[in-house]
Amino acid sequence: MIAGMFIRNFKTYQGINYIPIADLQNLSGFLGNNGIGKSSILEAIDTIFNDNSWNYNIVVKKGGLDKTAPYIVPFFILEYDFFNDEILPYAKAIDHIARNIKEDDATNATTKEVISNFILHRKRLFDRYDLSNKLLLPIGQDYNKSISLSIFGGKSLNMISEANFDGISLSREKIISNDYSDFSPLLSYILDYLEYLYIPKEIDSELFTKLESSGTQVLMGESLHAILDRIIGETTVTDINKELNTFLEEISDKLVNYSYRTPTDRQKKIQKREVYNLIIQAFFSVRKLHRKQSEEQYLEINNLSSGEKQKAIIDVAHALLTKHHQNGEKLIIAIDEPESSLHMSACFEQFNALS
C-alpha cells in the first residue's frame, strides 16, 4: 500500500511536507476544507505513476526549479515476495534507512519536523500491524524524473554507502552529488507492477465509463485488444488475409494486364491491431453506459444528475473490480470527492461500496 508521501513544492504544498495517507489497508480517506490539499495528494501520486505533467507550487515560478527542487516521494509498504532476487537488495537497503532514521539525522529545523512527523506515523503503523515481513520504501522522483529519496538521502543514506549491503554496493561519490540512480530499477519495478487510477471530481463520466477508455480497461484488468485477441485471435486474421489475397488474385486474372497492388514490392497485409481498432471503433465506441430504469427502459449516463453520475462511476468500478478484474490487489484507486452531489442518505452506501 501507499502509507504516506513526502512532497515538496507541488500544487498546494510549499516546502517539504510529509503526508500520512493510510492507517488502514483497504480504504483511506481525507477530510478537510476546500483548498487544504486533498486533491493535491491524489494528483501527485498520479503524476508519479502515470507520468502526468507536474503541477508546481507558486514558489517554483518565483524561485525557479533548480532552487525549489520539487519532488514527489510515495512511502510504499510492500511484501518481501513482491520483489525478485535482483531488486530485493535495493528495497532492503531503503527499508533499513526508513526503519532506523531518527530526528538527530535532520540537517535543519525543517527536515527535523518532517522526520518527526514520519516517525510518529511509522510508530502508529508499527503499533497496529506486524511489519516484520514487509518493506518500508520511501522512493519517488523529482521534477527532472531523477530518483528522489526525500529526507532519506544524503546523511541517512551514508549509513550504508561504501559498504556491501546485502549484495549491493553504493557509491559515496554518487550520494554526495545526490545521484540515487542506483535505485532507479527499484522504482521502475514498483511502478510496473502496481497500477494507480485517479478519478478526479471534474471527470467526464461518459468518456470515463466507455469500454474503450483507459480507466475502464484498468478496472477490468485487461485491454480491449486482449479481449479481442481471445475472441478473434491470430488465426482468424491470417484467414482473412488469405481470403482477401485470393480475391485480389482472381480479380487480377480477370483484368489480365492490370492488378490492384500497393506501391511497394511488399504487399501489405491487414495487421491484427488494425482489425481490433476497427472493431473497437465500429462496435464499442458507439455504445454508452446506460442505467436500467425498468425492464425495457434505460437512461443514458449523460441524462443522469451529477450525484447519479458519480454513483454510476463507483458502481461500475466496484462491479468490474469484484467481478471481472483477476488481480485487483495490485490496483490503487483514488477518487476525488466520491460523495460529491450525493444526498446525505446515499453517502453511506457510496462509502460502503468503496470499502
Region spans (language model):
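P-loop NTPase switch/coupling surface
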Residues: 1-221
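Switch/communication elements of ASCE P-loop NTPase nucleotide-binding domains
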Residues: 1-56, 289-355
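Extended helical coiled-coil dimerization/tether regions that scaffold
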Residues: 197, 201-335, 344
